[in-house]
Structure formats: structure tokens, C-alpha cells
Amino acid sequence: MTEPVRVQVQTANPYPVIIGRGLLGELVDELTGTRTVAIFHQPPLAETAEAVRAALAEKGIDAHRIEIPDAEDGKDLAVAGFCWEVLGRIGLTRSDAVVSLGGGAATDLAGFVAATWMRGVRVIHVPTTLLAMVDAAVGGKTGINTEAGKNLVGSFHEPSAVLIDLATLETVPRNEIVAGMAEVVKTGFIADPVILELIEKDPEAALDPTGTVLPELIRRSVEVKAKVVAADLRESDLREILNYGHTLGHAIERRERYRWRHGAAVAVGLVFAAELGRLAGRLDDATADRHRTILELVGLPTTYDADAFGQLVEGMQTDKKNRAGVLRFVVLDGLAKPGRLEGPDPSLLVAAYSAVAREGTPGTGGAVLL
């Protein structure tokens, strides 16, 4: 990919997702005319954040760095409160902007703070992990975690732009790319089978940030999400399909107190959801089995603790898709044919969980735990 690719998200407030390399100039252009900018970044990205701050300062923009805790530790009310205090000190107004620089947790937190500061200020996301590029940064979902569950406090607040700089993937550990691949695989199953074919053809190429396959996977994933979000921004109907595999996945994350990467938990959730669809008579055997095969090809886990089922069912009760206390799952009626399964019999859940249950310590699928 030599020239940047632009994917337009056609919501009521359209915005571009720009995919390319060396996009600092694009960020500066997006912020031209802004007086004050707050750059939210995670600790490993301090040097990059300083480069962004300096580039903005050269254009006369008063830019400030706000370092936030890494991963899910940053999605906390106390951290959000600290960020609000900083925004107050630097005098950030409605005509100013927030920039997120980091993984999915950084985009979630920065988006939430931007949504709530003065009832909404502009935010631009610069995702630096695969998961954030293909999922968290696009679509306007923001949120923080509480003891009650993951992302239960949040808002819909669309970014004014998303800048996906592919060069950043060359600096992250391989297990970050592996973890993000869960969302890519999910997208393939719900909407774009070409994604699955590309991974099956050459799994190593799919994980190579210097090659041509991974950028295509990112582009395809972003295009799918852009179409879904444009049709259903606030997750009233269609957008729920993006949560395929997430019902069990979020419950695993909560049980592990977020020590598992999001992608690892979603991978197990995808195998569970596929089995649920199979047992409900809605998904064919070949497509159900293909889930485990592809996820294992890229090094993701497909099993979890056999003794955890009771706790996971309890955790799934807080899922945002539920209605009137009834569990609701996204399942497949075939490849790229997502649907819903409401109130499945408990015996069906038990049988589906047997497909991922593993005695003793769950497999990590290649160091995808934090």
C-alpha cells in the first residue's frame, strides 16, 4: 500500500478512516485551526506522543500530553476523572480537540472523556494496535469499565477522523497482532469471507506488518464496520452483529479481571458462538469447525477453563444485548449470514460450552495473555 486509502463512514456526521503510512501530516492537517489539543497516550507511546505534540506546536497549536495507564487499567472512572481535571487546567473548550494515541482501551477512554467534556468535544483516533484499527477506533463507541461489567458506562461519540498508520504495527509485539486478529476473523465470518480465505491461504502473511496481506485485511475489516455503523450507529439492531463472539468473550475478560487480552477472549467466544449456532440447528458443521481451524492458524486460543461455566453464565447476564433478563446471542445461519438467538435453553449453553471447555489451565494459543 503506497498511497493512503480513505474509507468514508457515512453516518449523520461523516468522517474518514485513512489507512496508510507516515500519517503525521494528515493529523496536523485535521487539526489546523484548533487552538488547544490534548493527546491521550499510553506509556510505551510517550516518544511518539511527544513527536505529535512537537509537530502540532510548530503549527501554533497548544498541545498537551496526557499519559494514561496501559490496557484496561486505563478504562477506569478515576482515570477519566484525572483526565477531566487536566482538560480543565489546560482550558480545553468545545472548539478544541482530543487525540487518542494507542490501543483499543486508549480510544475507548479518550472517546468517553471527549464525549462527556462540555457535553462533547472533537476527538481524532490514531490507533496503534491491530485491534484498535479494525474495531475500537471506528464506530463511535466509547466507555469505561466498572465492577458490574465491561463498557457498561459509556456513550456514542463519533470521531472526526481515524488515522491508521500501518507503520506502527511494525513496532508492536507479535502477540498484539495475534490478539487483534480475532476481530478480523470475526468480520470474515459475519460479512466478508474473502478475509477468511486470505488468512487460510497464508497465515504468516496475514500476521506480517511489512507485507501486503495484513493491510488488505485491515481495509476489508474497516469497510465492513463502516457499512454496519452507517446503517445503525447506536446499536439498535444491525450493529449487534459486530458483537459476534463477544457475549462469552466479555464474560471471560471480566472473570480474568482483564488479564486476558480482548482478542484472546473473543476468540474463545467465537468458537462457543459457532457451536451454539450448530447445536441450535442453524449453522452447518463445516462452517462451525472452520472457526476453530482459522483461529488456531493465527495462534489464538480456542479453549477455556471447564470449571468456569457457572461464573461465565453469571457474567453474560450483564451483556448489553440482553433484554428483560433474557440472554441474546449473535449466531450464524451460514457463512456471512448473522442472526440472533434469544433465550436459549440452559442445556444448549452447557453443550456449547463443552466445545471450548478444557480441564486445568486454559490454553494461551501463543502468548496472548497479558
Swiss-Prot record:
It catalyses: 7-phospho-2-dehydro-3-deoxy-D-arabino-heptonate = 3-dehydroquinate + phosphate. The keyword Coiled coil does not apply. It is an enzyme of class 4 (lyase). It comes from the Bacteria. GO terms for biological process: amino acid biosynthetic process; aromatic amino acid family biosynthetic process; chorismate biosynthetic process. InterPro entries: Dehydroquinate_synthase, DHQ_synth_AroB, DHQ_synth_fam, DHQS/DOIS_N, DHQS_C. The keyword Mitochondrion does not apply. NAD(+) binds at residues 70-75, 104-108, 128-129, 141, 150, 168-171. Pathway: Metabolic intermediate biosynthesis; chorismate biosynthesis; chorismate from D-erythrose 4-phosphate and phosphoenolpyruvate: step 2/7. Transmembrane segments: none annotated. One of its GO terms (molecular function) is nucleotide binding. One of its GO terms (cellular component) is cytoplasm. It is found in: Cytoplasm. Its EC number is 4.2.3.4. CDD domains: DHQS. Keywords: Amino-acid biosynthesis, Aromatic amino acid biosynthesis, Cobalt, Cytoplasm, Lyase, Metal-binding, NAD, Nucleotide-binding, Zinc. Zn(2+) binds at residues 183, 246, 262. Its cofactor is Co(2+); Zn(2+); NAD(+). Catalyzes the conversion of 3-deoxy-D-arabino-heptulosonate 7-phosphate (DAHP) to dehydroquinate (DHQ). Belongs to the sugar phosphate cyclases superfamily. Dehydroquinate synthase family. NCBIfam families: aroB. This is 3-dehydroquinate synthase. It comes from Rhodococcus opacus (strain B4). The gene is aroB.
